[in-house]
A protein has these predicted regions:
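Glycine- and aromatic-enriched mobile tails/lids
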Residues: 1-6, 19-22, 29, 38-40, ...
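Short hydrophobic core segments
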Residues: 8-10, 195-204
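Glycine-rich Rossmann-fold phosphate-binding loop(s) that bind the pyrophosphate
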Residues: 12-14
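Short beta-strand "acidic-cap" motif of Rossmann-like dinucleotide-binding folds
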Residues: 29-35, 237
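Conserved N-terminal glycine-rich FAD pyrophosphate-binding loop of Rossmann-like flavoproteins
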Residues: 37-68, 74, 242-246, 255-256
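Short beta-strand to alpha-helix junction loop
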Residues: 77-90, 123-141, 152, 214-222, ...
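Conserved redox-cofactor binding core of oxidoreductases
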Residues: 97-191, 203, 247-251
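An anion/pyrophosphate-binding glycine-rich loop and adjacent beta-alpha core
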Residues: 227, 233-341, 346, 398, ...
Length: 528
């Protein structure tokens, strides 16, 4: 089956939906959103924190937000990208409000602003402790009420279409690679359909699911990054994987693991070993209030030293009523698995949280492949550099969605559908009856990435990961050519590709910088 759209959006988080709304209102063509799960299951929904934007000019200004972002990124952020996001943020906040997103306000009607780690001022807009879910709700409502946007839920993009599919040899040095759309798996027919487009936008989110434990949903398998890499597009900064230091240790919930907010440490929570011994004094004078990456590395090291699968966060010394008031959701969540946080330690461990790198884009969100844009966590704008500043990701998504919408609307009339694109050919393949091969390989990828390419790295571990991933790659490609395309084998391919990219970029950075910490090159660039 062949479908034709002017704008094809792959992914339905804040980036994909805001882009779709922006192009649809201009009435310049048909818009389709491909969503691998339900519309409400995007990673955006899991964002607890908020949206960073300068809204109180009496106390804050753009220069402060820019400087905070550069410091957090270890001074390898692209300053032009930082300026673009910070200076355009207020206008995009206003547009989200117009779409129906509710941010908490004070009695005087002004935004109730929070302050998070790394920010010098109060500038975080939020909706209670579920900002991402509120943004997703507001945008979903706007999407469903827009007759000009078609949504294909539970459809899976398998590959983007380029000249390669027309029989042309395409390499990473090939000039003018063009994207003509995507091959998409229909879950009802179990067939791969051809979606031709004039403009394609990749908004597939992050890749936390390549690790054993992640705050991301199970669908965060790095699909967009892998597809663009296979199509010979440019990726960047893949070594910078942000780990949240404290998720609830619950072997039954790993994708996503339940976040234990950093506000709990700000409230007075103390990190301890299960025997009650404190350990943060060995790593930082700020103890449990040290920055996220330092705390994550400290916990990781203590777990490895003592052979533990978790450490503990202790708030039992705080007033029980106050704890329940400040953290009602965490209290109820822990209680549901038999832990009363007013009397018991909370078992916590680090988890993969955010990919700072991804598909390299310019200030318009344009990738190295013509007619293809990338937005949100799957993209690498240069904003985050070596480490993401808290709450900068959601605003990055909408600012770049706006830039990409404006740029693509100017160019869409120059393009046409390429009717020479062949339909997906799976002749000679068979239905895979050996699902155990896929599930076992997924477990192996998770183990490899967590043990060898995690928070603390070494060349020995990275080379071992490279070798193991290479073997899995060969096995999986042979299987992929033999069986009909399915979501599980496509996700496995993507996970292996992304795991390889993280490993390769980590091997190439011979220093400790941002989120990349290696025992073989302990000096920071500034210390050399």
């Amino acid at each position: 089956m062949v479908y034709k759209y002017d704008f094809l959006v792959i992914g339905a988080g804040v980036a994909g939906m805001s882009y779709a709304l922006k192009v649809a209102r201009e009435k310049k063509g048909t818009v389709c959103i491909i969503c691998k799960a339900g519309l409400d299951e995007a990673n955006t929904s899991f964002a607890q924190g908020g949206v960073a934007s300068v809204t109180n000019l009496e106390l804050d200004n753009f220069d402060k937000h820019i400087e905070d972002t550069m410091i957090a990124g270890d001074f390898i952020s692209d300053r032009a990208a930082v300026e673009q996001v910070v200076r355009n943020a207020p206008a995009q906040i206003q547009e989200m409000v117009e779409w129906g997103v509710n941010f908490d306000r004070k009695d005087d009607g002004k935004f109730d602003l929070h302050r998070e780690g790394g920010h010098s001022e109060f500038r975080i807009l939020h909706h209670a402790d579920d900002t991402g879910a509120e943004i997703q709700r507001g945008l979903m409502e706007a999407i469903r009420n827009n007759p000009d946007i078609e949504v294909k839920e539970n459809h899976f993009a398998v590959e983007i279409i380029t000249q390669h599919h027309l029989g042309v040899r395409v390499t990473r040095r090939s000039p003018n690679i063009q994207c003509y759309g995507a091959y998409v798996l229909n879950p009802i027919t179990e067939k791969v359909d051809t979606y031709l487009s004039k403009v394609t936008v990749m908004c597939t989110g992050g890749c936390g699911a390549v690790y054993l434990t992640t705050s991301n949903p199970v669908i965060a398998t790095g699909d967009g990054i892998a597809m663009v890499y296979r199509a010979k597009g440019t990726v960047a900064d893949m070594e910078f994987v942000q780990f949240h230091p404290t998720v609830l240790h619950n072997p039954k919930e790993t994708h996503p693991a339940y976040l234990i907010t950093e506000a709990m440490r700000g409230y007075g929570g103390i990190l301890k070993l299960p025997n009650g011994e404190t350990f943060m004094e060995k790593y930082d004078e700020r103890l449990s209030l040290a920055p996220r990456d330092i705390v994550a590395r400290a916990i990781d090291k203590e777990m490895k030293i003592h052979g533990l699968d978790h450490v503990c966060l202790d708030v039992t010394h705080k007033d029980p009523a106050e704890t329940k008031h400040h953290f009602p959701n965490i209290y109820q969540k822990c209680l549901s698995i038999g832990i009363d946080i007013t009397t018991d330690y909370i078992p916590v461990r680090p988890a993969a949280h955010y990919m700072c790198g991804g598909i390299k884009v310019d200030l318009n969100g344009q990738t190295s492949i013509e007619r293809l844009y990338a937005l949100g966590e799957c993209s690498c704008t240069g904003l985050h550099g070596g480490n993401r500043l808290a709450s900068n990701s959601l605003i990055e998504a909408v600012v770049y969605a706006d830039a990409a919408a404006k740029d693509s609307l100017q160019h869409v009339d120059l393009y046409d559908w390429n009717d020479k694109v062949p339909e997906w050919n799976d002749e000679g393949t068979m239905t895979n009856e050996e699902k155990v091969l896929i599930t076992q390989s997924v477990r192996e990828v998770n183990q490899i990435m967590s043990n060898y390419v995690g928070i603390v790295r070494s060349d020995l571990r990275l080379h071992r990961a490279w070798d193991r991933l290479d073997m899995l790659y060969e096995e999986t490609e042979r299987l992929f050519k033999r069986v009909k395309a399915s979501r599980d084998i496509c996700e496995l391919r993507n996970m292996i590709n992304v795991g390889y990219l993280i490993t390769r970029w980590a091997l190439e950075r011979k220093e400790c910088r941002g989120l990349h910490f290696t025992t073989d090159y302990p000096l920071h660039a500034y210390d050399k």
